[in-house]
Amino acid sequence: MNIVLKLSSNACQQLSEKYKSYEQTSKNPYIRFFAKVGKTSISVYTSGKVVFQGSDAEKIASEFGHVAQVVPKKQTNLIGTDEVGNGSYFGGLMVTASFVSDNHLKFLKEMGVADSKKLTDEKICQIAPKLIEEIPHVALVVEPEKYNEVIASGYNAVSIKVALHNQAIYLLEKQLGSQPESIVIDAFTTEANYKKYVSAEKNHPLTNVTLLTKAEDQFLAVAVSSIISRYKFLENLKKLSKESSFTLPSGAENLSDKVAAQIIKSQGIDALNHLAKLHFANTQKAMKIAQL
């Protein structure tokens, strides 16, 4: 468990005094107080940011204003979201929000729905079209060119995902015409970060949002979104490969650097804007390989 809070100077002082007997030395120059309480660490930064990490993080953080998230108890009548493509240099970013009701349970069991990372691409391509047809959802596909434009406008890799998850949920609520009992997002950032970035967005869902790690293992709606997003990503990568006449790999490993370098040599550096997320380190590595 990892919880981040922004506390006032007085609150940081109170925390430091309360847990002074647990204080330990930290080599990080930006940490002004560090303590280890059982299996939980408390790091107070000079900026006022406080990080609680460990099994009792939520309990200790609640003493300083953290409100514990209520984890939905039901599998159904909720919206779940997940994204794919954020870790891949080539291809766009896909975010899907899906709504699962009691009526969908039998169908999803028959389909063998699970987290997309546990399914082969072949299996995903088999079941995703059926999920798209049967399950109420909103899938947002951001092509690399649009992604690069948004990043250049001031968004970062986290805030763009917050915006997309938020918009997908908002649009799905409108599509349903009613509020789900709960909304679960497969956590890709801290709750504090999510709230900070989502406050800048124009539209907001009517239902409270819960961020959970490994939510795709706990909620079918998140697993469905994971599969649909993966399918959309694979389709997008296939389309871009055809347009570029190169087989574009998924991920951000050395192979991506080499393929990008080949594209630069044959089509020029500008061609990458249509195919890849330019702010990734792969761009500079590819330019070095291409000797630009």
UniProtKB/Swiss-Prot annotation:
Cofactor binding notes: Manganese or magnesium. Binds 1 divalent metal ion per monomer in the absence of substrate. May bind a second metal ion after substrate binding.
EC assignment: 3.1.26.4
Catalytic activity: Endonucleolytic cleavage to 5'-phosphomonoester
Residues annotated as domain RNase H type-2: 76-292
Entry keyword Metal-binding: yes
GO cellular component: cytoplasm; ribonuclease H2 complex
InterPro entries in the cross-refs: RNase_HII/HIII, RNase_HII/HIII_dom, RNase_HIII, RNase_HIII_N, RNaseH-like_sf, RNaseH_sf, TBP_dom_sf
Cofactor(s) in the UniProt record: Mn(2+); Mg(2+)
Gene Ontology BP annotations: DNA replication, removal of RNA primer; mismatch repair
Localization annotation: Cytoplasm
Alphabetized Pfam families for the sequence: DUF3378, RNase_HII
Sorted UniProt keywords: Cytoplasm, Endonuclease, Hydrolase, Magnesium, Metal-binding, Nuclease
Coiled coil: none
Enzyme class, UniProt record, top EC level: hydrolase
Gene Ontology MF: a single term: RNA binding
Binding-site residues, a divalent metal cation: 82-83, 186
Family (UniProt): Belongs to the RNase HII family. RnhC subfamily.
Role summary: Endonuclease that specifically degrades the RNA of RNA-DNA hybrids.
HAMAP family the UniProt entry points to: RNase_HIII
UniProt name for this protein: Ribonuclease HIII
Organism encoding this protein: Lactococcus lactis subsp. cremoris (strain SK11)
